[in-house]
Design a protein with these regions (language model features):
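Solvent-exposed serine/threonine-rich low-complexity stretches and specific carbohydrate-binding patches
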Residues: 118-131
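Bacterial N-terminal signal peptides that target proteins for export
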Residues: 2-14
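Bacterial N-terminal signal peptides
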Residues: 11-23
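Contiguous beta-strand segments within globular domains
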Residues: 82-101
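Inward-facing hydrophobic residues that define packing positions of alpha-helical scaffold repeats
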Residues: 206-207
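Extracytoplasmic/surface-exposed domains of secreted proteins
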Residues: 97, 132-170
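Extended, polar beta-sheet/loop recognition surfaces of beta-rich domains
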Residues: 32-46, 51-58, 62, 75, ...
């Protein structure tokens, strides 16, 4: 199963990179056939993906960081395919990004809705761990769930370096048959189902959970490395998925 998943991830992302299809006709999926956007009622996600309206492309996906005129090994990175957006089935998803290894650096994470209204913001100082972080949007009473088929833009800022990266996230429905199959699946099978359905954010979250649950199993680290390389995030792929 893992070998098949790796093959699907690499081949589909490679196709997306080479063919340069316009943004509104690309779905950042793993092993599904891309459908043209439907400006009517959006379809639900199943193993064959979904149609959805076009969404504005956000800002930069990667920004190099320099300290004492030396470029750091890993750039500030939004962990997304080259198209810079992805899908989730979660009302409160987890969003992944990579910050460079500078301890004590302020990080500002912001999430805005389609009207550019601030939905959630948090600030923190980096520690001594170096890797790709998954930041969950908390299900607090004052934070509304993501609305279906609305484009939300998230931004990670490093004020110290005057640098920021952004990505788009769109929440979609899944079909009843998908939900039933997902509920009965093992952790590894769920990873495959999420990849097949093109749910980028949820696939990464599932992979990170597998890596945390089985830190001594190298296949999850290897798969993360291949995903990062296929998404043209080669430098961050050598660092752990936290």
């Amino acid at each position: 199963m893992i070998h098949r998943l790796k093959t699907l991830l690499v081949s589909l992302l490679a196709i997306a990179i080479v063919i340069a299809i316009p943004l509104l006709s690309i779905q950042p999926s793993i092993s599904v056939e891309f459908n043209p956007p439907d400006r009517g009622t959006p379809e639900q996600v199943d193993g064959g993906g979904t149609r959805f309206r076009d969404f504005a492309q956000p800002g930069d996906r990667m920004i190099p960081i320099f300290v004492n005129d030396q470029e750091l090994e890993c750039p500030l990175s939004a962990i997304l395919p080259p198209e810079n957006y992805g899908l989730t089935r979660q009302a409160y998803p987890t969003i992944f990004y990579h910050t460079p290894p500078v301890e004590g650096m302020e990080v500002i994470f912001s999430l805005r809705d389609a009207q550019e209204r601030l939905v959630y913001q948090t600030r923190y100082l980096t520690g001594d761990e170096h890797g790709t972080y998954g930041l969950p949007i908390p299900a607090f009473v004052n934070i509304p769930p993501l609305e279906l088929y609305q484009g939300y833009v998230w931004t990670v800022e490093l004020p110290k370096f005057d640098a920021s990266v952004s990505g788009t996230i769109v929440r979609v429905n899944t079909t009843e048959s998908f939900d039933e199959e997902f509920a009965a699946a093992s952790a590894e099978e769920r990873l495959q189902l999420l990849a097949d359905a093109g749910l980028w954010y949820d696939m990464l979250d599932q992979l990170a959970q597998l890596h945390r649950d089985r830190p001594d199993d190298p296949q999850w680290y290897d798969l993360w490395t291949e995903i990062a390389e296929a998404a043209e995030l080669m430098k961050v792929g050598t660092k752990p998925l936290l």
